[in-house]
């Protein structure tokens, strides 16, 4: 190990930055974020760097560096494009025993800056020892996606209760087990879900009860998006990997289901038109029953759970029974499939609004507000509209929409099996029969469809027409 990782307390302490350009500004921002007072020396100083120093009550020395600029400093940064000057700053710092960093010159450094993931008070540092800084930044980028932004709040919660827990659990091993359970349990999940006050209340109750605790279940209502696993949110993926039970729909792609925790129980509750594997009211009750057993229940739905996903009905039942839940939105099919098909839903020249419409109603009909749907300057997106497509096209034309209005069918959008067929209201039902189009298929109607010829970028199954 060429460098020993340490964390340096700079709160209220003086740091010298030699240099006044963009590079010096970047280093100065890091120092200021750590609470350091800045002394900047350079003949010319970047305007933003000047403001940064002034805001922090630091010192601006608009002149050349001098050997006497170091007194009182606990850290020195050389950030100029003058190599002899940088070497001089390094020699002077080393002679005085002051840690020094010279930008892009590891051999002249006694300390180096890592790539930083900041979830203060939790901080993660990644370093290549100056040998491969780009690689360190790439690793940091991965960590940024893996570590939730609310981990800082979680660490802060632990800090506030640390001494009380130590009093209740004087044994080190017992404390370690306590914190491990807390960081992986419902209290941590409340923080990560954006409910820190609730988490603190639960922890208070837990400690007041002498650490006796009964596990409380929770339901995660998660949108799985339109099919491409890369479109999942970070939060969705995290919850998928910690749930005890998964209730999933027919529209959840197998590749997404595979990302769930391996040992989680999986229950298929999918539906298709006139064929419900599990009735909706039974799904609602099942969520309540499983969560009441203390289980973490993942309700995984294709697209977004609040857009034609009946998510509102499910959480209404949970709320009525006092079951904790959180909702994770997903990319809805209209947005995802249209984007992968190269069809912008709005466009300044073609559509100033977009309307999402269900293709069949609760009683199986397509009794829709047709007059509203033929208003100019709008794009229509029909979910579950394949069976009722002949009626949809007929009624739109009957109520004033041109039979030559561009329209598209997007089957299994955003996946490798995606197929897109474009036509008009007049021939769209015929395309379904000719190409044996099947569900899940999204229907888009509007002038924006004609832009697909120019904007299509995703290949999919390459059977488009």
From Swiss-Prot:
The modification Phosphoserine is found at residue 128. It comes from the Bacteria. S-adenosyl-L-methionine binds at residues 226, 302-304, 307, 332-333, 384, 413. One of its GO terms (biological process) is cobalamin biosynthetic process. SUPFAM superfamilies: NAD(P)-binding Rossmann-fold domains, Siroheme synthase middle domains-like, Tetrapyrrole methylase. NAD(+) binds at residues 22-23, 43-44. The lineage of its organism: Bacteria, Pseudomonadati, Pseudomonadota, Gammaproteobacteria, Pseudomonadales. In the N-terminal section; belongs to the precorrin-2 dehydrogenase / sirohydrochlorin ferrochelatase family. In the C-terminal section; belongs to the precorrin methyltransferase family. Pathway: Cofactor biosynthesis; adenosylcobalamin biosynthesis; precorrin-2 from uroporphyrinogen III: step 1/1; Cofactor biosynthesis; adenosylcobalamin biosynthesis; sirohydrochlorin from precorrin-2: step 1/1; Porphyrin-containing compound metabolism; siroheme biosynthesis; precorrin-2 from uroporphyrinogen III: step 1/1; Porphyrin-containing compound metabolism; siroheme biosynthesis; siroheme from sirohydrochlorin: step 1/1. It catalyses: uroporphyrinogen III + 2 S-adenosyl-L-methionine = precorrin-2 + 2 S-adenosyl-L-homocysteine + H(+); precorrin-2 + NAD(+) = sirohydrochlorin + NADH + 2 H(+); siroheme + 2 H(+) = sirohydrochlorin + Fe(2+). The active site is at residues 249, 271. Residues 217-465 are annotated as: Uroporphyrinogen-III C-methyltransferase. The gene is cysG. Its EC number is 2.1.1.107, 1.3.1.76, 4.99.1.4. This is Siroheme synthase. Residues 1-203 are annotated as: Precorrin-2 dehydrogenase /sirohydrochlorin ferrochelatase. PANTHER family: SIROHEME SYNTHASE, SIROHEME SYNTHASE-RELATED. GO terms for molecular function: NAD binding; precorrin-2 dehydrogenase activity; sirohydrochlorin ferrochelatase activity; uroporphyrin-III C-methyltransferase activity. Then it catalyzes the NAD-dependent ring dehydrogenation of precorrin-2 to yield sirohydrochlorin. Finally, it catalyzes the ferrochelation of sirohydrochlorin to yield siroheme. Keywords: Cobalamin biosynthesis, Lyase, Methyltransferase, Multifunctional enzyme, NAD, Oxidoreductase, Phosphoprotein, Porphyrin biosynthesis, S-adenosyl-L-methionine, Transferase.
């Amino acid at each position: 190990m060429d460098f020993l990782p340490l964390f340096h307390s700079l709160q209220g302490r003086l740091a010298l930055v030699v240099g006044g350009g963009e590079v010096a500004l970047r280093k100065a921002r890091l120092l200021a974020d750590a609470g350091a007072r800045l002394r900047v020396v350079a003949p010319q100083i970047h305007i933003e760097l000047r403001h940064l120093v002034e805001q922090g009550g630091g010192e601006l020395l608009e002149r050349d560096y001098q050997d006497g600029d170091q007194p009182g400093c606990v850290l020195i940064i050389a950030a100029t494009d003058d190599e002899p000057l940088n070497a001089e700053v390094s020699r002077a710092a080393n002679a005085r025993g002051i840690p020094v960093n010279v930008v892009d010159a590891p051999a002249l450094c006694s300390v180096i800056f890592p790539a930083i993931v900041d979830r203060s008070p939790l901080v993660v540092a990644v370093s290549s020892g100056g040998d491969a800084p780009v690689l360190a930044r790439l690793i940091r980028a991965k960590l940024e996606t893996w570590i939730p932004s609310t981990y800082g709040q979680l660490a802060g919660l632990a800090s506030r209760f640390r001494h009380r827990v130590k009093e209740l659990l004087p044994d080190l091993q017992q404390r370690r087990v306590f914190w491990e359970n807390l960081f992986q349990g419902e209290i941590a999940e409340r923080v990560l879900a954006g409910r820190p006050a609730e988490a603190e209340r639960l922890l208070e109750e837990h400690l007041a009860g002498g650490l006796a605790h009964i596990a409380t279940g929770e339901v995660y209502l998660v949108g799985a998006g339109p099919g491409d696993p890369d479109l999942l949110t970070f939060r969705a993926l995290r919850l998928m990997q910690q749930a005890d039970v998964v209730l999933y729909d027919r529209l959840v792609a197998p590749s997404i289901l595979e990302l769930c925790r391996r040992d989680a129980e999986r229950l298929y509750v999918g539906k298709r038109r006139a064929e419900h594997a599990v009735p909706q009211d039974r799904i609602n009750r099942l969520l309540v029953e499983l969560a009441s057993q203390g289980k973490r229940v993942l309700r995984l739905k294709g697209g977004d759970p609040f857009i034609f996903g009946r998510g509102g009905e499910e959480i209404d039942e949970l709320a009525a029974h006092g079951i904790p839940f959180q909702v994770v939105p997903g990319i809805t099919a209209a947005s995802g499939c249209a984007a992968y098909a190269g069809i912008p839903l709005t466009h300044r020249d073609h559509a100033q609004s977009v309307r999402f419409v269900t293709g069949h109603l609760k009683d199986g009909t397509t009794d829709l507000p047709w007059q509203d749907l033929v208003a100019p300057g709008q794009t229509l997106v029909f979910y579950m509209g394949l069976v009722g497509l002949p009626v949809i096209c007929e009624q739109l034309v009957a109520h004033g929409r041109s039979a030559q209005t561009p329209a598209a069918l997007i089957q299994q959008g955003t996946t490798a099996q995606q197929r897109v067929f474009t036509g008009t209201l007049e021939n769209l039902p015929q395309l379904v029969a000719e190409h044996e189009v099947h569900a899940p298929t999204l229907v888009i109607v509007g002038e924006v469809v004609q832009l697909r010829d120019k904007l299509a970028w995703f290949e999919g199954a390459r059977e488009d027409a």
